[in-house]
Amino acid sequence: TLSSSSAASDVYKRQLDEKKDKALCTSGRIHTLGKVSFLYGRLEIKAKCPTGKGIWPAFWMLPAEEGLPFGEIDIMEYIDCWSSKEYQINVHVTDKKNGNRIKKMNPQLVKADVSKFHIYTLEWYKDKLVFLLDGNLCYQFDKKEGEAWPFDKPYYLILNVAYGGWGGSCGMDDSAFPCEMKVDWIRYYKLKE
C-alpha cells in the first residue's frame, strides 16, 4: 500500500489498485532516477521490511548513467533463504578485461530482524563504502589498487519489495500477504569538499 499527499504517488497507487484485479500480487518500487543522485556522503534509511518466503525487500543503488565499469550497491537485501534475523549487504563490480566481461560480488550477511525498524546507513567515500546498522559497523568495502572502482560517479536510490525471482529461490508462500515496507525517513548528508 502506498500513501502520500503527492499527486504522483496517488496516480501510482491507483495503477497498483487496477493491477490487483489481474494478478495475484504486484511487486513495487520507488526510485530517485532523474530526481536525486548521490555521490560521496552519508545515506540513512529508517525502515522495517516484510518477511516471508518469496518476499524480497531491498534498498539499493545503481549508476545514474550507464557504462563500464558498472557498480551496484546493495545497502539491505533480504530473502527467506536466510533467517528472518539476517539480511545481505553486497557490492557488485562489473568490468571488462581483455574483452571479457567480468563481474565480482562481495556479499556480507548481517544479523538483524528486518521486520523491526532499523537505521541502515551507507557512508560513501572516494576510496571506500562503509555500511552500518543502527550506528554499528557491519561491513567496509575498500578500493583496491589495479581493480575497477565504479563508485566515483553519481548513483540513484531504489527501494523495492519484490515477490519471486531470485527472492523466491528458496520457495514462495503467499500467506505473508498483504505485506508492506514501512519507511520512516531517508536522510542524505553530502561530504564537504
Report the location of each language-model feature.
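Short tryptophan-centered beta-strand motifs in secreted/extracellular beta-sheet-rich domains
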Residues: L43-I45, F117-W124, L129-F131
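Extracellular beta-strand elements of beta-rich domains used
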Residues: D184-Y188
